[in-house]
Amino acid sequence: MISSDPEAVSASAYREAMAQLASAVHLVTTDGPGGRAGLTATSVCSVSDGPPTLLVCLNRNSSAYPAFLRNGVLCINTLTAAHEGLATDFAGRVPQAERFAGPDWGRLQTGAPVLAGALVAFDCRIVDRHEVGTHDVLICAVEALAEISGAESLLYAGRHYRVLPRPDSESD
């Protein structure tokens, strides 16, 4: 069905369509006066490289949401294939208080938790916020980066985790 009428697209049809898109998987973390919190997200996107800016969409009904707003900082930790269990834990299978118990966590500039071994970590300050439907679009200035090389990326598509192998360096 093709329709340009926004009322003709149900929430369930939209969610089903979005489930077909492959997305990188991230742990979005924060720490500060609002407490330490984290969640799994796939709605992350580059905005600009001058200055380095990205966006992340967070559900305002998430138990972690108030901490992000109060702290004003976050780290987007892009996951490798080895982190599938963490992605599930941070998606709500484990209570907020227990999510940081497992792996090693560090800090960069903002103080938000940085996952050791993440494919890349974007340490950010929230500089703007837009309410759209059930979510907030957070515009984030990237203040520091941490990255590793050679790891396979974790993707989410069709409601399942998938692995994107690294390109063979000889075929580049």
Curated annotation (Swiss-Prot):
It holds the Pfam family Flavin_Reduct. InterPro entries: Flavin_Rdtase-like_dom, NADH-dep_flavin_reductase, RutF, Split_barrel_FMN-bd. Disulfide bonds: none annotated. Its EC number is 1.5.1.42. Gene3D superfamilies: Electron Transport, Fmn-binding Protein, Chain A. GO terms for biological process: nitrogen utilization; uracil catabolic process. One of its GO terms (molecular function) is riboflavin reductase (NADPH) activity. It catalyses: FMNH2 + NAD(+) = FMN + NADH + 2 H(+). Keywords: Flavoprotein, FMN, NAD, Oxidoreductase. Catalyzes the reduction of FMN to FMNH2 which is used to reduce pyrimidine by RutA via the Rut pathway. Belongs to the non-flavoprotein flavin reductase family. RutF subfamily. This is FMN reductase (NADH) RutF 2. It comes from Methylorubrum extorquens (strain PA1) (Methylobacterium extorquens). The gene is rutF2.
